[in-house]
């Protein structure tokens, strides 16, 4: 029994390593069939079983609606000897009325593989409010932001007002003002003479339903 358990753990490590290698190589995870072929498992149901156990152990995250959506957690990365790359979580920003900005890191978050080349220029914020719901940004979501001081019309940005308050809105530079446009038909835009762009939203993480 002990030998079987050891063999199962070894196979699961092989699965973890293969998923990691393929994401690093291609930018997206392998299919179940590709995993099976790589670790010498002919049955897709056996592969599914290994993935289910890895998920239960907290070593991977999966989206049941997307077959390829497999992601190693920080614990999964550490299991195969990889130190996860992280970006700072700088607190909360509003998608409604502007609120005071938070600049000190309250936590650190594993960086998605497709953004690792930009790791030093990224930070995360938790969104509060519902003014960006038409853009798919919900209350409680965490947005990944690339630090930059300029923006193109239509970009979703984190902007600082003259009162040192930050907000998440869609940016438009118009003739005599800057318009920070919410993505909610019930809300009016914010019109300002000047804003400071803290960064552009380049990704989103949701850990709630």
Curated annotation (Swiss-Prot):
Residue ranges: DNA binding: 32-52
Keywords: Autocatalytic cleavage, DNA damage, DNA repair, DNA replication, DNA-binding, Hydrolase, Repressor, SOS response, Transcription, Transcription regulation
Enzyme class: hydrolase
InterPro entries listed in its UniProt record: ArsR-like_HTH, LexA, LexA-like, LexA/Signal_pep-like_sf, LexA_DNA-bd_dom, LexA_repressor, Peptidase_S24_LexA, Peptidase_S24_S26A/B/C
EC number(s) per entry: 3.4.21.88
GO molecular function: DNA binding; serine-type endopeptidase activity
Annotated positions for site Cleavage: 95-96
Catalysis performed (reactions): Hydrolysis of Ala-|-Gly bond in repressor LexA
Residue positions of the active site: 131 (for autocatalytic cleavage activity), 169 (for autocatalytic cleavage activity)
GO biological process, one term: DNA replication
Assembly information from the UniProt record: Homodimer.
Functional description taken from the UniProt entry: Represses a number of genes involved in the response to DNA damage (SOS response), including recA and lexA. In the presence of single-stranded DNA, RecA interacts with LexA causing an autocatalytic cleavage which disrupts the DNA-binding part of LexA, leading to derepression of the SOS regulon and eventually DNA repair.
UniProt family annotation: Belongs to the peptidase S24 family.
Protein name, per record: LexA repressor
Gene source species: Enterococcus faecalis (strain ATCC 700802 / V583)
This protein's encoding gene: lexA
């Amino acid at each position: 029994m002990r030998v079987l358990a050891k063999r199962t753990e070894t196979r699961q490590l092989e699965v973890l390593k293969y998923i990691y290698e393929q994401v690093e190589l291609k930018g997206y995870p392998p299919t179940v069939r590709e995993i099976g072929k790589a670790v010498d498992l002919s049955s897709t149901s056996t592969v599914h079983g290994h993935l289910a156990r890895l998920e239960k152990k907290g070593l991977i995250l999966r989206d049941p609606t997307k077959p390829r959506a497999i992601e190693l957690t920080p614990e999964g990365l550490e299991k195969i000897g990889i130190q996860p790359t992280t970006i700072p979580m700088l607190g909360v920003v509003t998608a409604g009325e502007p609120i005071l900005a938070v600049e000190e890191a309250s936590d650190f978050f594993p960086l998605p593989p497709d953004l690792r080349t930009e790791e030093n220029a990224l930070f995360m914020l938790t969104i509060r409010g519902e003014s960006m719901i038409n853009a798919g940004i919900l209350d409680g979501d965490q947005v990944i932001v690339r630090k930059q001081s300029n923006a193109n019309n239509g970009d979703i940005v984190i902007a600082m007002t003259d009162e040192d308050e930050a907000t998440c809105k869609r940016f438009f530079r118009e003739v005599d003002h800057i318009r920070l446009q919410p993505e909610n038909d019930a809300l009016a835009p914010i019109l300002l003479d000047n804003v400071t762009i803290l960064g552009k939203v380049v990704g989103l993480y949701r850990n709630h339903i």
